[in-house]
Amino acid sequence: MTPSFRLIAVLPAIFVACLSQPLAAADNDLGRAYRAIASKRFVDLTHSFDPRSPVWSGFGQAKMTPAADPKTQRPYTIKEDGFRTTLYEFVGQYGTHVDPPAHFDEKGITMDAIPLKQMILPLIVLDATPYLQTDPNHAFSLTDLRAWEKRHGRIPRGSFVALRTDMYKDWDTDPERFKRAPFPAWSFETIKFLYEQRGVVATGHETLDTDTTDKMESETYILQHGRYQIEVMANLDKVPPKGALIVVTWPKVRNGLGFPARAFAILP
């Protein structure tokens, strides 16, 4: 069992252990795992978003307004009420977000039913950037994947596999370019291979969609086979090809079909 897998096995219970006894006295597996993890570098894989952030044209921009008293319509303020809060209105697939199976499959599980153990996984990062100079809309192929495995080894079963394209750099600086289509993404054959031959748990990418075309065959395959994906990821260029962990979570919306997520990597 690799160090990454040992950490995954105990990470979900660390937070409970921290509540039940002081960390200084915690000298069990969880305490040691916590100290190991706390000493590592963390990388945020999530974009900040607001009403100006890029989104698929079929959804429209978010709205964020001061929440108001429903009786008076007066916005709450710290001066008058001692607090303030915001009313958010946006589609579930906004910013860095989770797509659960039910997003594309009427019989698929919703975001509140995705197992907790699938939110902490070994992270593999495939780098598509070497191919983008000659093909800006490159679909990461099986040939590309085999070249990666020849260099870094076989992708472990149970991993989260993310595709690096560096598209995330346009999120704040050039939102219109970020929304361009087509864009670099997955090939359908690679997605099928990862799930069927490598047994990965989930996949993610930096772009607004899974596919380089509007056929959505890769996304349809993922979600209709009971898997989830994370879209619009950031900072994958700051994560090594293998050896890191990913932690990804989201609000527990009952029967939710998607929602902004928070993802981060713990580096080896």
Residue ranges of model-derived segments:
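Bacterial N-terminal signal peptides
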Residues: 9-19
